Amino acid sequence: HVCGLGSRDTLRIEAGYPLYGNELNTSLTPIQAGLGFFVGAELKQTLKEQFPNNLPKVVYFKVLEKAPPPRNGYEIFEGESSIGKVTSGCLSPLTGEGIGFALVNSKISLNESEKYSIFIRNRKYSLMFMKRGIIYS
């Protein structure tokens, strides 16, 4: 059972809500943080012109195997190449799966389970990137 900040983190991660200092900060644009829908069309176009498409972006994931909880700083891989790190993660009480946010530096594919993995406690586990929030899936 979780309580205090642990319950806050679990609930926000399950819902797909980012946290300032983890998934949101002054060095990421709203588009990188996955919040482009809050930005007006004119500013969105300006941001896209100013920043290349290969900038890191915040994405939501779930671990596809029984695994320890994903934690901040754990590496995400595409094949053998590191493509990013976890910014927030937990085990979901709803599904029993590891879920979280990661900052990745490459284009990723949603709902593909063959390509991606996470390194947790010296072992790789398969993961899948998905739309935010397991309660909305």
Label each residue range with its predicted role:
Residues 1-137:
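Conserved, structured C-terminal
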